[in-house]
Amino acid sequence: WRLQSDERVDVHDRTNVRHLRGEDIGGLVDIVVADLSFISLSLVLPAFAASVRPGADLLPMVKPQFEVGKERVGSGGVVRDPRLRAEAVYRVARDAASLGLMTRDVVASPLPGPSGNVEYFLWLTYRPDENDSAEYRFDERPTGERHTDAHRSRPAARADDTVEENGEGEGDGRLWEMIHRAVDEGPR
């Protein structure tokens, strides 16, 4: 309530974020932070791209339980397989790239979701002149420690359906490196 009653906050209750446009919120913005539930980010990324200025930064939280499909979510609504979590982040990043939202980095939230799900922040920058779903492009990102490959030896819930196993993600090495680092460094 404190946030809603702050005079600096412009509340848009009853707004479907999938249909959001810059003119709905007083013009294009420079930053978007999104923590959405019960919807795939891929469904709202077009609205985000339509609501930001070129060069804007976006920080959406990827919640794998809403990205992998209900048939691949474990008991209690938790995605336990790290490869499925990595796949969820990858698919959102690829969809973002097709809209000119370039991945700069990926980091795991240090706090698991209420049910224990591990969630991830994507740092995206809007570069409308670089939207290209055939060849993934990256902005420069801060360098960090080298990730480990420890989780890759664990079996996936359905390995034949993961994008790494079926070759869908070939050619996206740098993106996978960022994702695997985030999965490796995140909560277990």
Which residues fall in each region the model found?
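Conserved S-adenosyl-L-methionine
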Residues: 101-112
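S-adenosyl-L-methionine
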Residues: 1-27
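Short SAM/SAH-binding signature in class I
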Residues: 27-35
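Residue-level signal for inorganic ion chemistry
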Residues: 63, 116
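Short, glycine-/aromatic-enriched active-site segment of Class I SAM-dependent methyltransferases
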Residues: 64-80
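Flexible, glycine-/basic-rich loop-and-beta segments that form/coincide
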Residues: 118, 123-157, 161-188
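Short alpha-helix
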Residues: 85-99
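A short glycine-rich, Lys/Arg-flanked "PGG" loop and its adjoining helix->strand segment in the class I
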Residues: 42-57
